[in-house]
UniProtKB/Swiss-Prot annotation:
Source superkingdom: Eukaryota
Protein name (record): Protein YIM1
GO cellular component, one term: lipid droplet
Keywords recorded for this protein, A-Z: Lipid droplet, Mitochondrion
């Protein structure tokens, strides 16, 4: 028997807490499941949204465990598990779930890797001369590998699931260049797909921070003239050419009334994609109205909408974990870390996320 600590919640009105149970490592898993001793996990906005929206009448009174992203070591493997996943393998990935007693904010994570395929063998990030070195060597591979699966997988879906073919002539406009999904997107877009032009909209104070990741152009929203600023850029730098895709990672409606001026015709296969809907979510006080607005649902089913529109949801597939492995090995990708907290500092980690001021991912070290 071992101790299983988990960071849990009952509903959005209760405070997160560490709950402790006894776990029988030899009998806690099915023959198609693996048991991972978690080294690090990362906190994501979805964790706080699910927590904030939970009510006992809807989600029950049992403790639910936070967390999706993880890095760790396989300590048990069932007899029917694919032999590529063996005891002592160092792995990372995303445990895709909504609610339940299993989550990555735990000492041990149990799941079926044939169903939850977003898992990979952990990679060693290049160090020293020639490496991307966005984190200046501050963090170990457990931290780095735990930080990115969800945001990387989301960025991969944006680029792989909607546009049939990317070329050096392709153009993307990203609303919210400073988010971590957008940070992954720019690295994948420029270094894997070789997309010709990627433009990001962000705070002008973040230009210097963002430039090193590969943005071709950055546009400020500070003066309240985002539409005018993007129009000027298109006229002066892009030959008046429109975008193949507009990706919204923050929640914005500015472009909808004038979408035809910026997005190529629907018939070309262009897309407007979002991960948050039309409005920025308040992670401290999320509401169903903002998390699942009717306007988003209507855009998705409206046959008369003049442009292709979709929300992006990351799935438990292995494609993006394989791509991340390839890009790390080629020194083409490195996630950015804002801060690392110890397990009992989970509330500080959550509070930092809720400030919306983190410059990179927030990671919790579960076991050393």
């Amino acid at each position: 028997m071992v101790q299983q600590r988990s960071i849990t919640f009952v509903d959005g009105y209760s405070k997160p807490a560490i709950t402790t149970t006894e776990l029988d490592l030899d009998n806690c898993f099915k023959d198609d499941e693996i048991v991972i001793k978690v080294k690090c996990c990362a906190i994501n906005p979805i964790d706080m949204v699910v927590y904030g929206l939970s009510t006992t009448w809807l989600t029950g009174c049992k403790p639910k465990t936070f967390g999706r992203d993880f890095s760790g070591v396989i300590v048990r493997a069932g007899s029917r598990v694919d032999p590529q996943w063996k005891v002592d393998d160092e792995v990372n990935g995303q445990y895709v779930h909504l609610l339940g007693d299993r989550g990555s904010f735990s000492d041990y994570l149990i799941f079926n890797p044939a169903k939850n395929k977003s898992i990979a063998h952990m990679q060693k990030f290049p160090r020293g001369e020639g490496a991307l070195n966005y984190n200046e060597g501050k963090y170990d591979d457990w931290v780095l590998n735990a930080s990115f699966p969800l945001v990387y997988g989301t960025a991969d879906s944006v680029l792989a699931d909607y546009i049939k073919k990317w070329t050096p002539e392709s153009r993307i406009l990203v609303i919210g260049a400073s988010t971590q999904v957008s940070n992954c997107l720019i690295q994948i877009a420029k270094r894997h797909y070789n997309i010709g032009t990627v433009v990001g909209i962000c705070n002008k104070n973040s230009f210097e921070y963002n430039e090193k990741f590969g943005w071709d152009h950055l546009v400020s929203y500070n003066d309240g003239k985002t539409i005018e600023n993007v129009t000027k850029l298109m006229e002066e730098k892009l030959g008046g050419e429109k975008f193949d895709m507009i990706f919204d990672s923050v929640g914005n409606t500015d472009f909808f009334p004038v979408i035809d001026k910026f997005l190529k015709p629907k018939s070309t296969g262009s897309y407007f994609l979002t991960v948050v809907g039309d409005n920025k979510l308040d992670y401290k006080n999320p509401t169903f109205r903002r998390a699942m607005p009717l306007s988003v649902a209507w855009k998705k089913i409206n046959p008369f909408l003049g442009f292709n529109y979709s929300t992006v949801l990351v799935k438990p597939i292995d494609r993006y974990m394989k791509l991340s492995t390839e890009m790390i090995q080629k020194n083409q990708f490195e996630p950015v870390i804002d801060s690392v907290y110890e397990f009992d500092q989970y509330q500080e980690a959550m509070d930092k996320l809720l400030t919306n001021k983190a410059k990179g991912k927030i990671v919790i070290r579960v076991n050393k």
